[in-house]
Curated annotation (Swiss-Prot):
GO BP of this protein: proton motive force-driven plasma membrane ATP synthesis
Protein source organism: Clostridium novyi (strain NT)
Task performed by this protein: Produces ATP from ADP in the presence of a proton gradient across the membrane. The V-type beta chain is a regulatory subunit.
UniProt similarity note: Belongs to the ATPase alpha/beta chains family.
Pfam families per record: ATP-synt_ab, ATP-synt_ab_N, ATP-synt_VA_C
Protein name in the entry: V-type ATP synthase beta chain
InterPro entries to which the protein is assigned, alphabetical: ATP-synt_VA_C, ATPase_a/bsu_AS, ATPase_F1/V1/A1_a/bsu_N, ATPase_F1/V1/A1_a/bsu_nucl-bd, P-loop_NTPase, V-ATPase_su_B/beta
Length: 460
């Protein structure tokens, strides 16, 4: 039998303190009935003697301290799961938002998931083709990896996220591929963009969307990625799917954490964020991966906007410690009209070596990748030198590198948001650009690959 309390002592922001409680547990789901009969929900955030601090999901407006009834439900926040969720749009708490029927769950699960035994993890080693050359060719995404996108305000990360969700696939595999898309604190226009893009291209049939809008309660943002990841775990480990989880915008998630932390009067950490921000982010990012003996996998692409384009800000800084690399969007490239504006030099995929090569992409992938990186870096240096000393001061080799850098940005990195390049097309495009440089400069590529791909039409 559920106990009902009418002992609300205090309400501060999204938090409510109830006293005189017994047998209440941490993270327990709470039902709050207002004097008007309206039902709201929350979860137990902290317990001290006979007091329980409750985090409210739908906000605290209109709560009367004397008349409000509180019921502790004896279970954590759960989400109903089913394969029928594919092709549907839900709000940030997992309720249908597309006008369709409620999901009849095959099972219900705690949104916090269960810790994965490190020994049970399988090492990521299979290539995922996103259709984006700057990622596939130079910062390869591997099945089971977590690879964030570091963006800035006003940069087209939403378009890139939609493009990856639309185009991503595992090559040479008959396994089903699904996308779980979690949006936190986005505007109505952004939400419409994602829904219309997925619907128009037909990719919504393999996608589950969770939408927490900017005018939804900030506290709901803390639950949204956990609900999305619980759904991904169900599809991956119970249904054997390869699941790509895209979470945007993690900055809004961290802001919601900061809001709750401030309401709890906790001692702030760097820039006002709670001291446990690193630990909290890890509970999301570490839910990516593969499990031995299970055919499915979870690959994560969290997207965050860096305040003031600052890579040292706590959110990108701590994210970089947990994840396996980063894809960085450049405002300079964006101003040049390079789309997507991926800055390949500071970007990194720490697991790229595991997902490329013979039988995965192509034998020449690693060598051409290293040569493209080296050529682009030297080309940028040559262009900087030309700005200071003038083009006449450049040697013929430097001019070739400067020409290569321009062509690399315009033809390789820039492809628009509707072009889906296969890995073969990406690698052949790399060889085409390398022909701009003298053969003597291609020191990072083995001779047999130069003979096979540079001197023949196979590399075109």
């Amino acid at each position: 039998m559920l106990k009902e309390y009418k002992t609300v002592q205090e309400v501060v922001g999204p938090l409510m303190l109830v006293e005189g409680t017994k047998g209440v547990t941490y993270d327990e789901l709470v039902e709050i009935e207002l004097q008007t009969g309206e039902i709201r929900h929350g979860r137990v955030l902290e317990i001290s003697e006979d007091k329980a601090l409750i985090q409210l999901f739908e906000g605290s407006t209109g709560i009367n301290l004397k008349e409000t009834k509180t019921r502790f439900l004896g279970k954590p926040l759960e989400v109903g799961l089913s394969e029928d969720m594919l092709g549907r749009v839900f709000d940030g708490m997992g309720r249908p938002k597309d006008g369709g029927p409620k999901i009849i769950p095959e099972e219900r699960r705690d949104i916090n998931g269960e810790p994965l035994n490190p020994f049970a993890r399988d090492y990521p080693s299979e290539f995922i083709q996103t259709g984006v050359s700057a990622i596939d060719g130079l910062n390869t995404l591997v099945r089971g990896q977590k690879l964030p996108v570091f963006s800035g305000s006003g940069l087209p990360h939403a378009e890139l996220a939609a493009q990856i969700a639309r185009q991503a696939k595992v090559l040479g595999s008959d396994s089903k591929f699904a996308v779980v898309f979690a949006a936190m604190g986005i505007t109505f226009e952004e939400a419409q963009f994602f829904i219309q893009d997925f619907t128009k291209t037909g990719s919504i049939d393999r996608t589950v969307l969770f939408m927490n809008l900017a005018n939804d309660p900030a506290v709901e943002r803390i639950a949204t990625p956990r609900i999305a990841l619980t759904t991904a775990e169900f599809l991956a480990y119970e249904k054997g799917m390869h699941v790509l989880v895209i979470m945007t915008d993690m900055t809004n998630y961290a802001e919601a954490l900061r809001e709750v932390s401030a309401a709890r009067k906790e001692v702030p950490g760097r820039r006002g964020y709670p001291g446990y921000l690193y630990t909290d982010l890890s509970t999301l990012y570490e839910r990516a991966g593969r499990v031995k003996g299970k055919p499915g996998s979870i690959t994560q692409i969290p997207i965050l906007t860096m305040p003031e384009d600052d890579k040292t800000h706590p959110i990108p800084d701590l994210t970089g410690y947990i994840t396996e690399g980063q894809i960085i969007l450049s405002r300079e490239l964006y101003k040049k009209g390079i789309m997507p504006p991926i800055d390949v030099l500071p970007s990194l995929s720490r697991l790229k070596d595991k997902g490329i090569g013979k039988d995965k992409t192509r034998e020449d992938h690693a060598d051409t990748m290293n040569q493209l990186f080296a050529g682009y870096a030297q080309g940028k240096q040559a262009k900087e030198l030309a700005v200071i000393l003038g083009e006449s001061a450049l040697s013929d080799i430097d001019k070739a590198y400067a020409k290569f850098a321009d062509a690399f940005e315009k033809e390789y990195v820039s492809q628009g948001f509707n072009t889906n390049r296969s890995i073969e097309e990406t690698l052949n495009l790399g060889w085409k650009l390398l022909k701009i440089l003298p053969r003597t400069e291609l020191k990072r590529i083995r001779d047999e690959y130069l003979e096979k791909y540079l001197d023949t039409k196979e590399g075109e």
